[in-house]
């Protein structure tokens, strides 16, 4: 009795497709509608092709009984064996086109030499002597006589063997002994080696096929080794294309360097004919003398060194003649230029000058054609008043000098210096007298005076600057000790003053510095218009008024308010109103406070909100890096009233079949050594979804690179649509299955 498997058909429309043994049950049928073939499986688990139809394939042997008629071409792969005698008036064996790619080899018998080959070029090849009875006619005749060229006996072999190729006209000749050419030898290539030259036309290879002489162009050829051009020779110059090493070797040894004999040289240049015939007039590279190799550069021109790195001499060098430097001579070590009245730099590094140093200023800014005078520094002196003088001047007069005054000088004996003008300096320090011919004179330590009638004050006396007028400042009253005051004096009385001093009471240990602006009257700590106190005890700054600044930098501030008085307590910042801002909530905790209610905050691991508080965003919420979002429920807006152009998915199953589900490792932060860290996860690949549903993929930057992000809400919709299609198909299959069961039940009664 047939089973349901044996009465059903499997179908395909794919050309060339055949079922496998695993796909068919015994006796089950499969139809290829494209190839018009039928298959089944027998009890030996073999697939059987049940018919040829309009074409087909037979897998196995065919035994033909009767005549075989073939219309069309017969293609055979393998050998064709004919048993018995085959009689035919004509046997035409050939190729389907003029381009024959193989030889036809008839096998006449097993006897050696009885077979022959018809080659693809139309020739007949027979392994033994071919005897032609009668006349042999051929458009191309090749006569060949081979000789053993290893036999050296005179007269035994031909003096020349020639092979002529009628296709390309090549003549291959073996020449034994001496070759004499009466006039000239012309050949596009010449190889003095066992292989054809690889240097190109009109070239000569020597030893191997890529070493020798290579013709480049008209009048230009190169000396080549291993296909590398070493020297190139042209009509007016020779080019060295690789490093050139001049050395001396023995007559028959071209590889081992040796020392050249005395009086010889490695390279020379003829320079005697340009008017400078010093010595023998020649220039030498590596002239061998008793000291070794020397180098001579001669000629009527100039020896120029224009290297950006400069001219370097690694060993001690001496100039036996005068060296004239017309421009700039720069030396990073020692220069010795000797001569009377000139420069002498000794081996100890001392420089002796026999005259004046003149400095020519360079143009920096301003008008470029404005005159710039030479600045001179000179050393001189006399034997009595001014023993040694070092002076700087220009054509308009002296600037300054320093000298050792002698016993005949009106100045005190010793070292002194003078400036012919004003002197500006941040500090003037001297263990002796500092004198200025103008308004300032200092004659002892801790004293100062201003003006023609300067008064002198002890160092403990406060310094008072009164717009050019110097007045003694009152010591202060009420425990206030002023140290500095800047007055605005209008000629009729004291007005506003800027005061810096100390404030203390009795023997109080800690005093406070006072920075104040005061009105008219004596210097009293109680009469400041504005004042700031600096505590000696803890370094704090106190102000009786608000501190206004565009920015504040401080090591520690207990609390402060931004445009408001802080009511949040210590370690807090009030912003806008007195109970709204940031407040310290414990070790590592910062609280966000609004109207004295804690809204949220952050600690070392989290940013949090208090219970009952919410985070509301009118834009996107982005989670970067390897973090995750954890929540109990995720509610996404899906109200029909906020949507338009609602359409069902087309072919959701086909779309879903192009998207794979995967497990993988995904980036999650970094390891302690800085390398990328990963964690296990599972999901989809955004690029696969983008290929079929690009609207579900967005690109955003995670701070280091652009990352594609996936709308899984859309994937849920796609899954739902695909499930609906599958549900419909399942219901249809259930209906068909019921019908098949009814048929089977009927057939098996």
From Swiss-Prot:
It comes from Salmonella phage S16. Residues 638-737 form the Peptidase S74 domain. Its main location: virion. Homotrimer. Interacts with the receptor-recognizing protein Gp38. One of its GO terms (biological process) is virion attachment to host cell. It is found in: Virion. Residues 633-636 are annotated as: Interaction with the receptor-recognizing protein gp38. This is Long tail fiber protein Gp37. Keywords: Coiled coil, Host-virus interaction, Viral attachment to host cell, Viral tail fiber protein, Viral tail protein, Virion, Virus entry into host cell. Belongs to the S16-like long tail fiber protein Gp37 family. Proteolytic cleavage and release of the chaperone in the host cytosol stabilizes the folded protein. Residues 720-749 form a coiled coil. The record marks 638-639 as: Cleavage. GO terms for cellular component: virus tail, fiber.
